[in-house]
Amino acid sequence: MADIFRTDKPLAVSPIKTGQPLGAILASLGIEHSIPLVHGAQGCSAFAKVFFIQHFHDPVPLQSTAMDPTSTIMGADGNIFTALDTLCQRNNPQAIVLLSTGLSEAQGSDISRVVRQFREEYPRHKGVAILTVNTPDFYGSMENGFSAVLESVIEQWVPPAPRPAQRNRRVNLLVSHLCSPGDIEWLRRCVEAFGLQPIILPDLAQSMDGHLAQGDFSPLTQGGTPLRQIEQMGQSLCSFAIGVSLHRASSLLAPRCRGEVIALPHLMTLERCDAFIHQLAKISGRAVPEWLERQRGQLQDAMIDCHMWLQGQRMAIAAEGDLLAAWCDFANSQGMQPGPLVAPTGHPSLRQLPVERVVPGDLEDLQTLLCAHPADLLVANSHARDLAEQFALPLVRAGFPLFDKLGEFRRVRQGYSGMRDTLFELANLIRERHHHLAHYRSPLRQNPESSLSTGGAYAAD
C-alpha cells in the first residue's frame, strides 16, 4: 500500500493537473451527434479547445454560455436558456452535455434545475437529450471529470430497472481516459472476434480517431456512442469497466442491467489481458481467435527480447491515477522499478498502488524527487519534455495533452499488441540512451591523424 505524501506548497509550478471540465469534454466527445456546452466564461471553453486541438490536431465541437461579470453576479440562467435554444435550433443535436465550471459552481448555479425549467418553457426541444454534469475546476482533476460524465450518463439516460428483453450477444464496455482511440479500436475488434456486439462508452474511436470526414466542419461530434444504444445498455449480456476511476460508474450500472459487471483496472499486463479474453470466451462460448493467440505469442517473444534491456530500469511517472496504476503494474510485470511517482491530486485510490510513496504535486516536485532518486525513463505528458531534457531521460508520452509528436493521441498501449509495441519502444529508448566511452588514444602515438584515416596503420619513416 502506497503512502500519499502531501506537500505544503502554496502554488503549482509546471502543473500536470488539468481541470474536471477538460475530462468531461473529452468524454462528451465520445457520444454520437452531441455537443459539449460549458457553463462558464468564454475563456473556459477557449482554453480547453486549444488543448484539444493541440492533442488531436483536429477541430473540436465545443460551445459556451459566455458568462460575463453582470451575469456572474446577477444570475446566468438566461445564458443557459439562450445557449440551449440556439444549439437546438441551429445544430439539431441528438444530445447536449451541459457542464459546470469553477465560475458557475462558485456562483451556486443549479444546472439541473435550469434544465428542468428549460423543458417547461421550450417543449418544442423535447427530442434533444440534455445531460447535466457538475465539474468544478477547484476539485479533482481531468480523471474526475471524465468519470463524472459516465456516471451522469448512467444515472440520467440508462433506465433504472433492467428491461425484460435481453440481448444475448451484446456487451457493454465502460472505458476510462487511459484508453486512447487506438486502444478502443483494439477492444472493439476483440469483442467482435467472439461474435459479440460491443456498446463502448465513450466511443472516442468513432469520433476522435483522426479520420478525414466527408463534408465541411460539423458543429456536432461525428461518430461516438449512439444515444439509442446507451438507453439499451441494461439489456446487455455482460459489462466491463476498464479503469480504477470507473468504480462508481460500474456500481451505478450494476442494478440497471441483467448481466454481470466485471471491473478491470487496465489491460497493460499479461494477467489482466488474459482475464479479459477469458471472460469474452466464457460468455460467448467460442474459442479464442487465432489472431489473438498469435498476438499473445508475439508479446511473449517481445518480453524475452527486451528483458535484458528493461530488467531493473527505474521508471518515473507523472500522470493521473488510472495511468499510474497501469504503468506501475506494467513496470513491475517486466522487472522494472516504478518510481518516483507524482499524481495531480491525492485521490484515496492511490493508496492501492504497488509502491512505497506517491506525491500529489507538479513537475517541480518530480524534479526534486529525481534529484534524490534518479530514474532511467520518464512517463508523462508533453509538458514534461523540458524536464526530460534536463535529466537526459527518454520521455515516454502518456496522458493529456500530447502535442509535440504526431499520432501520439491514438497510440495503442492496452492489450497484447499495445504491450508488445510499448516493450519495443522502451527497450529502444534505453539502448539509445546508452553512453559509449571514447577509445583511449595515447598522446605518444605516431602520426595519429594518418592512422585514423588509414584504419589504424602507422606510417613508415
Curated annotation (Swiss-Prot):
InterPro entries: ChlB/BchB/BchZ, Nase/OxRdtase_comp1, Nase_comp1_CS, Nase_Mo-Fe_CF
Keywords: Metal-binding, Nitrogen fixation
Gene Ontology molecular functions: metal ion binding; nitrogenase activity
Biochemical pathway: Cofactor biosynthesis; Fe-Mo cofactor biosynthesis
PANTHER family reported for this sequence: LIGHT-INDEPENDENT PROTOCHLOROPHYLLIDE REDUCTASE SUBUNIT B (PTHR33712:SF7)
NCBIfam families recorded: nifN
Family as reported in the entry's similarity comment: Belongs to the NifD/NifK/NifE/NifN family.
Protein name: Nitrogenase iron-molybdenum cofactor biosynthesis protein NifN
UniProt source species: Klebsiella pneumoniae
